[in-house]
């Protein structure tokens, strides 16, 4: 290796992830086995549309993911919601993806994916009564309150000095 030249490598990501849209769609469709118990399923066209919407949301929010993303986790978490029907399922999932990434940005990634999804689900099924509009407003307020007065997380240094 020539030490006079800088060494680096460039990873080019197409659409925000390493999986192609068809691969993402297959990953999404694999959730149908679980969601069928709740009368919910996605068609290949809907799964592909969700993969595309996810990529567009990643670009809009300036985020990058190196795997299939959060869609499968959202699907598994929300499939038992009493507010999801076959008629609103795909559209609701698309909006949940948008809200998920917006919440991640607003909370500066201080809440892990699983915890954020659990909070979103609790708010969606609880006080929001299945309303995505309320989730967009109240959900963020609830998350910010949970993360501390500034909405940016607990200040561990301050907590130590209060002893």
Place the predicted regions along the sequence by residue.
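Short terminal alpha-helical segments
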Residues: 2-56
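Long, low-complexity, intrinsically disordered segments
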Residues: 161-163
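Acidic, low-complexity, intrinsically disordered interaction modules
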Residues: 42-159
